[in-house]
Amino acid sequence: MARVTVEDCIDKVDNRFELVLLASHRARQISQGSSITVDRDNDKNPVVALREIADETLSPDDLKEDLIHSLQKHVEVDEPEPDPVTLAASAADGEDDDQPETVTFDQMSEEELLAGIEGLVPPEKNDDY
């Protein structure tokens, strides 16, 4: 059985810390049932993940992208931005329509804010908490 070391993978992923992150993420994927792309040879999941990276059966960039998506709590959706020409045309046409007015916020000084906070009444204590 050939041993896979970090030196076998370091030419594929330049940073050792990034290599550890990618290999551990891939090992977790394997333990969750993802199919492996190399022969197992009775190796454990971290070794299989390192062998996949060393043999270039998986792209490190794809693994990095997948790792980032797995750590995101809010996924951004790329929506196409409207064309500026279309926006200008719709603004010119929409002047006659009943458009909601733009919302403006009042400005408050720090003293007014502090006075407002001091004037707040604390909620009554309840046994529910």
From Swiss-Prot:
The entry's keywords: DNA-directed RNA polymerase, Nucleotidyltransferase, Transcription, Transferase
Record's keyword annotation contains Metal-binding: no
Nucleotidyltransferase keyword on record: yes
Pfam families linked: RNA_pol_Rpb6
Catalytic function, reaction form: RNA(n) + a ribonucleoside 5'-triphosphate = RNA(n+1) + diphosphate
This enzyme's EC code(s): 2.7.7.6
Superkingdom of origin: Bacteria
Record-linked InterPro entries: DNA-dir_RNA_pol_omega (IPR003716), Pol_omega/Rpo6/RPB6 (IPR006110), RPB6/omega-like_sf (IPR036161)
Annotated region described as Disordered, given as residue ranges: 76-101
SMART domains linked: RNA_pol_Rpb6
Family: Belongs to the RNA polymerase subunit omega family.
Function in brief: Promotes RNA polymerase assembly. Latches the N- and C-terminal regions of the beta' subunit thereby facilitating its interaction with the beta and alpha subunits.
Subunit-structure text: The RNAP catalytic core consists of 2 alpha, 1 beta, 1 beta' and 1 omega subunit. When a sigma factor is associated with the core the holoenzyme is formed, which can initiate transcription.
Protein name per Swiss-Prot or TrEMBL: DNA-directed RNA polymerase subunit omega
